[in-house]
């Protein structure tokens, strides 16, 4: 088995962990390769372009946090991904540094379990043709530098849902419900729920609320405004600047992400830890 290793190069502890991991793999005669950016920063060989890793490797190891794992997921396709969190417990990167070798051994022995995560697909026009962008967490359209409040026209399966006056619109998966959508007032959705959530960002009216829809719906979004350009973000990365009247289509992607499950963690435990639920009770006990 060959592992692809992706490192958060901006964290010293992640770089150190990469040295530990590759030494451990070498001692056991196991194959690995880093993406070219991680390889250059760590000085570890071999390395190759991120786009080539999936064809050459059997599993991915992400060293960093949820952001690093999100980045890795865009290239892993259906290969299993081990998320090692070098900081605090993550929603996606479930394994701690101390659990890293155990996680790798589970994959080697075939004794691991998988969290299958759905993705979003955004269909947009780019460079004169259609392009399909994927997002594990969310697809977001924001007002950007536009000085007024734009109107976001949203249709579900060609039926008008509403015209939202807001600073932006978030379309999130159940996985992404604990990310930007949660900060904007959206609900927490259990990972295996077959739904998406549409969450307005700072809506103009108090009656505008997030709405949960089944993931078999097709969502059409366009922006009404007098000029301006509006950033389209997929998992936090600006993919395109939308013009007024331009329509994007968001639906469930056929591509899934396979995250290696930490059997020592439970979903409710992760929620309590990350969101400090019951923290006062624990402090007072």
From Swiss-Prot:
A molecular function GO annotation: metal ion binding
Top-level class of the enzyme under EC nomenclature: transferase
Entry keyword annotation includes Transmembrane helix: no
Protein's name according to its UniProt entry: NAD kinase
Cofactors (names): a divalent metal cation
Keyword Cytoplasm assigned: yes
Cellular component aspect of the GO annotation: cytoplasm
Enzyme Commission number(s): 2.7.1.23
């Amino acid at each position: 088995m060959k592992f692809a290793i992706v490192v958060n190069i901006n964290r010293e502890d992640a770089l150190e962990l990469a040295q530990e991991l590759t030494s451990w793999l070498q001692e056991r005669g196991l194959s690995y390769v880093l993406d070219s950016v991680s390889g250059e920063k760590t000085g570890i060989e071999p390395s190759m372009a991120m786009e080539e890793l999936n064809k050459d490797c059997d599993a991915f190891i992400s060293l960093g946090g949820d952001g690093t794992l999100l980045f890795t997921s865009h290239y892993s396709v259906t290969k299993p991904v081990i998320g090692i969190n070098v900081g605090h417990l993550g929603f996606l990167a479930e394994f701690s540094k101390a659990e890293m070798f155990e996680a790798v051994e589970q994959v080697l022995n075939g004794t691991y379990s998988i969290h299958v995560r759905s993705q979003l697909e955004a269909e947009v026009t780019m460079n004169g043709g259609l392009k399909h962008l994927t997002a594990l967490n969310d697809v977001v359209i924001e007002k950007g530098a536009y000085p007024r409040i734009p109107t976001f026209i949203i249709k579900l399966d060609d039926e008008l849902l509403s015209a939202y006056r807001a600073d932006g619109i978030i379309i999130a998966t159940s996985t992404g419900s604990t990310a930007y959508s949660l900060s904007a007032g959206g609900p927490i959705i259990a990972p295996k729920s077959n739904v998406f959530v549409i969450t307005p960002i700072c809506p103009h009216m108090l009656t505008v609320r997030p709405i949960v829809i089944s993931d078999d719906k097709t969502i059409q979004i366009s922006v009404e405004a007098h000029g301006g350009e509006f950033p389209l973000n997929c998992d936090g990365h600006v993919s395109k600047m939308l013009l007024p009247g331009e329509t994007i289509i968001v639906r469930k992607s056929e591509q899934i992400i396979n995250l290696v499950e930490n059997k020592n963690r439970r979903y409710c435990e992760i929620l309590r830890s990350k969101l400090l639920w019951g923290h006062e009770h624990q402090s007072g006990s």
